[in-house]
């Protein structure tokens, strides 16, 4: 039994010695990658567009004393993305039906009327019209 213990101890030391030896080439690879990592950082930087700041601004206009959790903000962001996706699909479908290559404000307005229900559609159309006139006048 004592010889097996002696054999186990060197066996344990050998993998321990190999592990740092393996780490050294990895470190060298990392050093070689660091020179090109500036390029990779530029490639991997994706601008994630969210509506979180705009949702927060609207919340503060409506209820200045109320906050919102990050989970609720994520849900609201997903909701806005979903609504915009539905509006884009519907306006694209309308443009195809009318054999037009361009989606104009008219297609967007009709899509809003089709996608959003009742009173919400009326308010959205009036706010959208107001935003378009403000944009074209400036």
From Swiss-Prot:
The keyword Ubl conjugation applies. There is a cross-link at residue 134 (Glycyl lysine isopeptide (Lys-Gly) (interchain with G-Cter in ubiquitin)). The keyword Nucleus applies. GO terms for cellular component: nucleosome; nucleus. Keywords: Acetylation, Chromosome, DNA-binding, Isopeptide bond, Nucleosome core, Nucleus, Ubl conjugation. Gene3D superfamilies: Histone, subunit A (1.10.20.10). It comes from the Eukaryota. It is found in: Nucleus; Chromosome. Residues 1-38 have a biased composition (Basic and acidic residues). Can be acetylated to form H2BK6ac, H2BK33ac and H2BK34ac. SMART domains: H2B. GO terms for molecular function: DNA binding; protein heterodimerization activity; structural constituent of chromatin. The modification N6-acetyllysine is found at residues 8, 29-30. Disulfide bonds: none annotated. Residues 1-46 are annotated as: Disordered. The nucleosome is a histone octamer containing two molecules each of H2A, H2B, H3 and H4 assembled in one H3-H4 heterotetramer and two H2A-H2B heterodimers. The octamer wraps approximately 147 bp of DNA. Belongs to the histone H2B family. Core component of nucleosome. Nucleosomes wrap and compact DNA into chromatin, limiting DNA accessibility to the cellular machineries which require DNA as a template. Histones thereby play a central role in transcription regulation, DNA repair, DNA replication and chromosomal stability. DNA accessibility is regulated via a complex set of post-translational modifications of histones, also called histone code, and nucleosome remodeling. This is Probable histone H2B.3. It comes from Medicago truncatula (Barrel medic). The lineage of its organism: Eukaryota, Viridiplantae, Streptophyta, Embryophyta, Tracheophyta.
């Amino acid at each position: 039994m004592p010889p097996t213990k002696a054999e186990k101890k060197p066996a344990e030391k050998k993998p321990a010695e190999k592990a740092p030896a393996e780490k050294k080439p990895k470190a060298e690879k990392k050093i070689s990658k660091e020179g090109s990592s500036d390029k990779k950082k530029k490639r991997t930087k994706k601008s994630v567009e969210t509506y979180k700041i705009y949702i927060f601004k609207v919340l503060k206009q409506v209820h200045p004393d109320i906050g919102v959790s990050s989970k609720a903000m994520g849900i609201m962001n997903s909701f806005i993305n979903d609504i915009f996706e539905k509006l884009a699909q519907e306006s694209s479908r309308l443009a195809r039906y009318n054999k037009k290559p361009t989606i104009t404000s008219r297609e967007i307005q009709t899509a809003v009327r089709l996608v959003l229900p009742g009173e919400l559609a009326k308010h959205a159309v009036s706010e959208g019209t107001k935003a378009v006139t403000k944009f074209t006048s400036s």
